[in-house]
Amino acid sequence: MGLGEASARGTSMEGDCLSCIKYLMFVFNFLIFLGGSFLLGVGVWVVVDPTGFREIVAANPLLFTGVYIILAMGGMLFLLGFLGCCGAIRENKCLLLFFFMLILIIFLAELAAAILAFIFREHLTREYFTKELKKHYQGYNNTDVFTSTWNAIMNTFDCCGVNSPEDFEESIFRIINPSEMVPEACCRRNNHVGESGFSNREECLSGSMLYRNNKGCYSAVVDYFEMYIYVAGALAIVVLTIELFAMVFAMCLFRGIQ
């Protein structure tokens, strides 16, 4: 076998490898494109949802900000996936370099956000919701979205307060209702007793632990959604992995293009 034949075979193998990287990069970027489209769809649905979820989100600044963060991330991933697909198919070095720099910035930002969210998840979340409950929960004002949402949560999950019934101490609820230790939504229900369904409403409102729900809603909701939280965490790891591979493929393709 001559040197020319060996060189030609090496060039052919290099070309095949480059083509493989190009199509792998296209596949990974198409997945990023689909992920961005999904986040955009979820964000738009929450913003325009006519069933009332829009009002709940609008009433809570944290949720309101979160929806627009989802929209922004969805838009960036949508654009990122599109640029990556175009750069791979067209073998455009400028597009590939721009794609690499953009996805590197997003990757580092997502990684930092995930680490911070994991480190501060419990302390900040409990602290925030407890503070908001004390400031805004009114008890029986069902025209107030914040109050009606909390009533629905406490009735659905048979819980009381964020951490415990003691969260209502020194709250606006106690100022409005000084004779009640906890709101009616905290009272235990028994559908076989009377029309109201309460085991003993009066004893509950006066503070008796026997007739109220003593578990905090934070723990109750986290326990209920525990599986979904792990799924969300797994999806975040998958997204970060896809982005990492996309960066590697982009740089390999960039270096391989003559």
UniProtKB/Swiss-Prot annotation:
Glycosylation sites: N141
Gene3D superfamilies: Tetraspanin
A GO biological-process term: regulation of sprouting angiogenesis
Predominant location: membrane
Taxonomy of the source species: Eukaryota, Metazoa, Chordata, Craniata, Vertebrata
The protein's name in its UniProt record: Tetraspanin-18B
Originating organism: Danio rerio
InterPro entries in the record: Tetraspanin/Peripherin, Tetraspanin_animals, Tetraspanin_CS, Tetraspanin_EC2_sf
Protein family: Belongs to the tetraspanin (TM4SF) family.
